[in-house]
């Protein structure tokens, strides 16, 4: 038997971006062809897509760790790395995406809707893309950015039109089994139903869906019984049906007190909801009372006696039925269909939106801005936060001195050096950006404009003269040991001047 899973925690890791390539063009008769390193490929995204073929979150229960493909590294000859393959996870309609704080990020209600759960990292630039007038032959490239990695919570809220609520063993599962083709587990003992059941009810040429959730007891909002965990499946319902057991022999229970107790638990659940379904809160949702088990003579008499009192006290329609004997079902079906059709007309139209892109959090880490604050753990140290500097740190190969110099140029141009001076930083102060700590050595004097240095330049690219064939031949003979490096032949002084430029 398949397990019904309606809540899972996913551990997501999008693909990292590929690294840029450091390469110099090599071709016969084209010396010093310039940099031609390609860019790294973008890391693969993790995407949630709604499909009608999936009805539970069971697969994610057994495989909660998800990682997308990494982007390929760039290569020489201006060849960019391939993009990492996106990983698409299929989810059922009604899936709600929450962050670790429980805040709703997306409500996936329609087939075809997509949500980028984790974005892949950008690929690093190759040295060809880094070349500029001041830096004609970069000897470094940028590292690919890591993909997003975080946990998300998926909750499944059934898209049923009618929700059945009631005490354990009130006959909810029996009712849904005779009104639809659903085959729930049925038994004459409390908490027979341990998971929600869904069924499609046919009324002539019309249909509506019905959800049966595990029974509630007083104190469910405090965790008693099965608690209120399954009530998320009735949040989207157009009408709530109180299924009341009129044949119960439990002391202190009667149909009216049962309804009052259930309403108290629903009110406690409503107070914890923060979602607008467009149908109003649960207290405003239409109600119907179903007095079940009328096949028992004493129960039928009690139902007939209390029907008018219930209608006066609560103002809701009351139906007397027997799910076991299939008695009184047709009037109930038509009344439910009437309410559902009216609710469908009033329900807000869904936006024609096939893709939902998760927005980035808006705070001080906005693009182009940064903050400098004292480091509480290092005396005289500072911590720098900001979208750009933290991203640049991740892109830097700290084993390459030229790449480190390029990072220093960028930070200076962004204004971080001036910011450190204003914050009172001294030469040699410990500065931390994105988990990387280093000693601060200012590149410019106070008040000067930060100008990108000539790191990555190659003086050979500025030369207009080229060595002759004879000179290349002599250099080859020297390397092979056929002649002495200082042997310039006859007229040595003139030759020496020519060889040494």
From Swiss-Prot:
Residues 2-159 form the Obg domain. One of its GO terms (molecular function) is GTP binding. Its main location: cytoplasm. One of its GO terms (cellular component) is cytoplasm. It is an enzyme of class 3 (hydrolase). Keywords: Cytoplasm, GTP-binding, Hydrolase, Magnesium, Metal-binding, Nucleotide-binding. Residues 160-341 form the OBG-type G domain. An essential GTPase which binds GTP, GDP and possibly (p)ppGpp with moderate affinity, with high nucleotide exchange rates and a fairly low GTP hydrolysis rate. Plays a role in control of the cell cycle, stress response, ribosome biogenesis and in those bacteria that undergo differentiation, in morphogenesis control. Monomer. HAMAP family: GTPase_Obg. This is GTPase Obg. The gene is obg.
């Amino acid at each position: 038997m398949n397990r019904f899973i309606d809540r899972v925690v996913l551990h997501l890791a999008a693909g990292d971006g590929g690294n840029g390539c450091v390469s110099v063009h090599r071709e016969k008769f084209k010396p010093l062809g310039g940099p031609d390193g390609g860019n790294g490929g973008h890391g693969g995204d993790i995407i949630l897509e709604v499909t009608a073929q999936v009805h539970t979150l069971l697969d994610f229960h057994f495989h909660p760790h998800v990682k997308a493909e990494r982007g390929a590294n760039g290569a020489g000859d201006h060849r960019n790395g391939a993009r990492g393959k996106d990983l698409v996870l299929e989810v059922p309609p009604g899936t709600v995406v929450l962050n670790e704080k429980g805040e709703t990020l997306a409500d996936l209600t329609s087939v075809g809707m997509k949500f980028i759960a984790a974005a892949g990292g950008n690929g690093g630039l190759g040295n060809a893309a880094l070349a500029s007038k001041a830096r004609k032959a970069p000897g470094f490239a940028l590292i690919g950015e890591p993909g997003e990695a975080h946990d998300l919570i998926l909750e499944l809220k059934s898209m049923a039109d009618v929700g059945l609520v009631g005490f354990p063993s009130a006959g909810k599962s029996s009712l849904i089994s005779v009104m639809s083709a659903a085959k729930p587990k049925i038994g004459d003992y409390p908490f027979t139903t341990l998971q929600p059941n869904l069924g499609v009810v046919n009324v002539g040429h019309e249909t509506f869906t019905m959800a049966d959730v595990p029974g509630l007891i007083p104190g469910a909002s405090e965790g008693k019984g099965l608690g209120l965990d399954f009530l998320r499946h009735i949040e989207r319902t157009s009408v709530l049906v109180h299924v009341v057991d009129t044949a119960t022999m439990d002391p202190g229970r009667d149909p009216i007190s049962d309804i009052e107790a259930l309403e108290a638990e629903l009110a406690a659940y409503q107070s914890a909801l923060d979602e607008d379904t467009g149908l109003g809160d649960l207290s405003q949702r239409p109600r119907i009372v179903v007095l079940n088990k009328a096949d028992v003579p004493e129960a039928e008499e009690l139902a007939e006696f209390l029907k008018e009192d219930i209608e006066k006290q609560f103002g809701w329609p009351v139906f007397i039925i027997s799910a076991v004997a299939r008695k009184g079902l047709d009037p109930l079906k038509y009344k439910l269909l009437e309410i559902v059709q009216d609710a469908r007309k009033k329900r807000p139209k869904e936006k024609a939106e096939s893709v939902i892109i998760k927005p980035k959090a808006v705070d001080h880490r906005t693009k182009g801005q940064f903050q400098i604050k004292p480091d509480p753990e290092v005396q005289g140290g500072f911590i720098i936060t900001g979208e750009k500097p933290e991203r640049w740190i991740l892109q830097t190969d700290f084993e390459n001195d030229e790449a480190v110099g390029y990072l220093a140029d960028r930070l200076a141009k962004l204004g971080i050096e001036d910011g450190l001076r204003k914050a009172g930083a001294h030469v040699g102060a410990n500065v931390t950006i994105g988990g990387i700590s280093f000693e601060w050595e200012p590149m410019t004097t106070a008040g000067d404009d930060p100008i990108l240095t000539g790191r990555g330049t190659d003086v050979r690219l500025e030369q207009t003269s080229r060595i002759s064939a004879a000179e290349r031949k002599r250099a080859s003979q020297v390397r092979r040991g056929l002649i002495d490096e200082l042997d310039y032949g006859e007229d040595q002084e003139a030759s020496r001047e020519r060889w040494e430029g």
